[in-house]
């Protein structure tokens, strides 16, 4: 039986230069221990490979290269004995390999390789396999070395770097061999489960999780190639259904990318926000929710950029319209204000219908809305005497007992009227003397008609005109 041959070869391999007596005693001691522990070690270590390896204490320094291959498939003797439950186990393992350095260089890894590929369930057989002569042992060693050369290229890149290390952090990163077709450890599947949980919480990485889960099933022998597209997918979420090959996926990405960048270049000068959107999407920021993503990523960007450009154009148009209205008001303030004053006078004359009142309010409101709010505060700070003088000059009576149909002005109407007068004063009349005289000459006939209809004397009109001039100044 092939399993019987490797027990003496494995036990005596590391001690060809040392005394045979010490190894014989340690071999017997170890075999007695392993016979009781063998089956329990196999059944336990088949599912949990890293438990005994991390807990074996002082065996870690010399025995990593020797323990390592058996950790991947089945740890029959090493796990059961190296748990530290027996006092003599540490001495047996340490001395059988410790007084000779060959296990660290090539001896330990090569013998472990034999056990790794031939499945040495030697712990069930007991001490009966020790009765072998050294010649048989050396012949078996030669056969094992021939077998070792067949698998050296595959296994040694992953086994030799780990042999020199004291811990086992990069064991899952090893290049694929026959061991990974049926992984015994529960750590690699749990790693993939963690990725799935994260992807469920994060909607941007949902497609990447589906890709990694599918890749882990059909590419168990190629862990490195499946992890690279999954990370790449996490960085750049794409709506297309994830293909199994990363090359096709990259081609998909190049198809989608130019459209989004072109849409950003179109609106780059009008809207700086849309420039950052496709760049952020290519960099991995999940800007689009899964609802938008099934169609493609470029249309939402184009839609949003066009919306933003439309909004910015509208706002600029409003601003330009506002500036135009301001210029028109400064040029035609006299005519507009005179129209407003005419409507006020007509309302107070005798035709007290609600229509001219509404028209007057509308005219004042249209002109007053375009004014800045700073002037409003300045208007409210003026004295009441000047306002009353203006109203009297317009023909307004403080105590309208004479005319029963005359409606008193409300506070809102007064405020609007003061706004218009203050604007006129600031724009043209106070600055330019020509405009002032012209306005007085133009507005005087309206005042005279209003006052005549209100049954006022000529002296009162002259006094009102002088007071009005003082108020304008």
From Swiss-Prot:
| Molecular function (Gene Ontology), one example | RNA binding
Q: What's a Pfam family this protein contains? A: Vasculin
Task: Write out the biased-composition intervals (Basic residues).
Answer: 113-125
Give the highest taxon in the source lineage.
Answer: Eukaryota
The PTM Phosphothreonine maps to 298
* Region feature Disordered, mapped onto this chain: 14-55, 88-127, 155-189, 235-267, 281-316, 453-473
Q: One GO CC annotation, please?
A: nucleus
Keywords, sorted A to Z: DNA-binding, Nucleus, Phosphoprotein, Transcription, Transcription regulation
- Give start-end positions of Basic and acidic residues composition bias: 26-38
Tell me where it mainly resides: nucleus
Q: Which family does it belong to?
A: Belongs to the vasculin family.
Q: What does this protein do?
A: Possible transcription factor.
Q: What is this protein called?
A: Vasculin-like protein 1
Q: Specify the species.
A: Mus musculus (Mouse)
